[in-house]
Amino acid sequence: MGSSKFKRAIGAVKDQTSVGLAKVNGRSASLSELDVAIVKATRHEEFPAEEKYIREILSLTSYSRSYINACVSTLSRRLNKTKCWTVALKTLILIQRLLGEGDQAYEQEIFFATRRGTRLLNMSDFRDVSRSNSWDYSAFVRTYALYLDERLDFRMQARHGKRGVYCVGGEADEEEQDQAAADLSTAIVVRSQPIAEMKTEQIFIRIQHLQQLLDRFLACRPTGNARNNRVVIVALYPIVKESFQIYYDVTEIMGILIERFMELDIPDSIKVYDIFCRVSKQFEELDQFYSWCKNMGIARSSEYPEIEKITQKKLDLMDEFIRDKSALEHTKQSKSVKSEADEDDDEARTEEVNEEQEDMNAIKALPEPPPKEEDDVKPEEEAKEEVIIEKKQEEMGDLLDLGNTNGGEAGQAGDSLALALFDGPYASGSGSESGPGWEAFKDDSADWETALVQTATNLSGQKSELGGGFDMLLLNGMYQHGAVNAAVKTSTAYGASGSASSMAFGSAGRPAATMLALPAPSTANGNAGNINSPVPMDPFAASLEVAPPAYVQMNDMEKKQRMLMEEQMMWDQYSRDGRQGHMNLRQNQNQPYSYTPQY
């Protein structure tokens, strides 16, 4: 308690000294009164400044621009020298009152004084070291100065058109133009432009600055011991009233952005989404700040606006809409790219076609037709070429006689081949014993069934067949088997060779027959040598005169050689062991062959 009382006494002494120096500074009486009023309005006492001193300062600076400059210089020196948070905060409260209720020249003077490096609203390094519990107060002083600086910058930039032609709360701004005399005699009133008539880019700029200003206001929420200090509460009252208008401006801009959201491009839609996300967090903090202010009795509860919070559901809907729109835009771009590529291909094709098309004027006329003599010579040459080609084609041999187009000869060959299969003399005459020849069925008969029966009854010489499919032709062939064997034995070229017990032909050194069991080829009379021979004419006799292919002869020779080797082995076994009954014969049969053909 002693230290605090001592510090208060020292502060009171400093205030009295400052008042005395202000009275004897040698300047005019009005300037001396201004300095004394500023010192009394910013005393070291932890009580709000008296209203009469603030009104005196406002009245003294309303006459001339020079008084405004002197007031700003005095306030700057006061902030630069003091290390007490009470003096600094009271000075900032006075500046806020002068900016809000004083002349418009205060804004310009304080703005340029701060930008020139004068310590007026730049309190970022301020710290009260006189007390141990002054940290919360020092922090509030720094944040309060930042809010005032941001507010002043916002208004100045709005007035000079660097942030658009608008102002907070729709107030009428006056643009001052300094003349040669540098007085306040000239002023132009610039009316604010309605937000609904602004362009989207201007709306984005405005709401970004409003959000920055709202962040500065939210940072002014006191903490610790500063929450219950009277000077701090008095300093909060004017800025809380200003925050109401900031909130209304932000909500108005949000409504306009929602109306334009469906028509915006994807980049602008993303900006709107980011703005809404930031505003959502700011409104939550603002609601909490207003609740504390209501509890502390700062302004009336009816003056506070109802905070319309932005729910997460609304943000999700906006995000989903942006995603769908971007996906649709992407598909359109891909289709447009494909269509452009197709158009380029079509243009290239048309260019190629145009290049390929010949100019009709560049086409030359055909020459005159040649004389008729040349036309007559050409057909003769073509006829000669055709004759030569036909001769070359006829020179090729047709072994199977398939190229013969004579229908009569082909039919006779087929009939002779079919009749050769029957056993009996071939009769060429129509009145032979074999009956009438085959006749084609006539289609012009009206009653085809009757004609078919009559034709069947006229067939003569039909041979009956025995039951079970036994053919008489087979029976006659069995009776003639002996005659065929006799003819084969008597044949010199096709006789058999080898011993009587041999199973292979040609084993006795004589050549084997080309066809083993066929009779000798017939003569011109139809039989082999003897006309009265019972052996009929062989229809395949002509093929006996042609030697078989080489691979057929090789295969036949291998078979004969293998059979000869088997026969020799059996005879050797028989001569060595003799007859030993069935067992020995069975062993001989089970003995594997010692000869293996090699190909």
UniProtKB/Swiss-Prot annotation:
Polar residues: bias regions: 585-599
Signal peptide annotation: none
Molecular function in Gene Ontology: 1-phosphatidylinositol binding; clathrin binding
Highest taxon, organism lineage: Eukaryota
Ranges of residues in domain ENTH: 26-162
Extent of Acidic residues compositional bias: 341-359, 373-382
Compartment(s): Membrane, Clathrin-coated pit; Golgi apparatus; Cytoplasmic vesicle, Clathrin-coated vesicle
Region (Disordered), start-end ranges: 332-382, 580-599
Keywords of this entry: Coated pit, Cytoplasmic vesicle, Endocytosis, Golgi apparatus, Membrane
Any single Pfam family the record assigns to this protein: ANTH
SUPFAM superfamilies (UniProt xref): ENTH/VHS domain, GAT-like domain
GO biological process, one term: protein localization to plasma membrane
InterPro entries (alphabetical): ANTH_dom, ANTH_dom_sf, ANTH_N_plant, AP180-like, ENTH, ENTH_VHS
Gene Ontology cellular-component terms listed: clathrin-coated pit; clathrin-coated vesicle; Golgi apparatus; pollen tube; pollen tube tip
Transmembrane segments: none
PANTHER family, sorted: CLATHRIN ASSEMBLY PROTEIN (PTHR22951), OS05G0426100 PROTEIN (PTHR22951:SF12)
Protein's UniProt name: Putative clathrin assembly protein At1g03050
Species this chain originates from: Arabidopsis thaliana
